[in-house]
Amino acid sequence: MPLSTQPPASGERYVLTACLDNARNLSSLLRAVHFQDHATCFATANGLKVTVEDAKCLQANAFIQAEIFQEFAIQEESVMFRINLAVLLDCLTIFGASSLPGTSTALRMCYRGYGYPLILFLEEGGVVTVCKINTQEPEELLDFDFCSTNVVNKIILQSEGLREAFAELDMTSEVLQITMSPDKPYFRLSTFGNAGSAHLDYPKDSDLMEAFHCNQTQTNRYKISLLKPSTKALALSCKVSIRTDTRGFLSLQYMIRNEDGQICFVEYYCCPDEDVTEADL
């Protein structure tokens, strides 16, 4: 019997039940935000959001819409818990390299509520494994207050363009400087490493540029150590939306197509490292 059609054991009431025919559609997105051991899971009728934070300066969110799941049932307005992300990923890939080509691991994920473990039923080739992962009290998450009304500049790039940039830029630099402007250089990435300064420019009519909406010239610096985790999402994505707001906060939203061709999103928020004056440029 497929996991998605198995009824819960008698007397068990889950506040959250989610089923996937292919667990990789979840694990690949979770890897894209796995730069700390713990994550906060937040579920509503719209789907599941998994949030990871670092040093109160960086926040990553993986969004898995309810439509991605073969079954997604929630009995409360919202469900929230903290979990060890490394353990969750280990469980989701428990069949690992033993998987035969063309096969996938089916997943049924159940949660009874506060204080209870997250239960994973994983099935592949007729073999079912059950994992129970302890959940924790969720911590208060950062509110980056990044709203669209305060966005000053926004561009959408094909991800290959940004992947090439990260491969070419000098990662010995402590910061990545991002310039966005309605005039030249339009979109510029700069580093200041051991070999000196390096700049990479993207004209607004570049084949890689899908959208260009810049209202004013803005130059901000961001710690490369904070941006490096986002390259995990970049590697999986087909497009990336880059936005800055009036405070210089950065939003990187990656559009990721899963193995079934469905679109999911991973978003990174990063605060600027320092203000850059005209004298610095």
Model-derived features: positions:
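DNA polymerase sliding clamps and clamp-related checkpoint/processivity subunits
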Residues: 1-172, 179-281
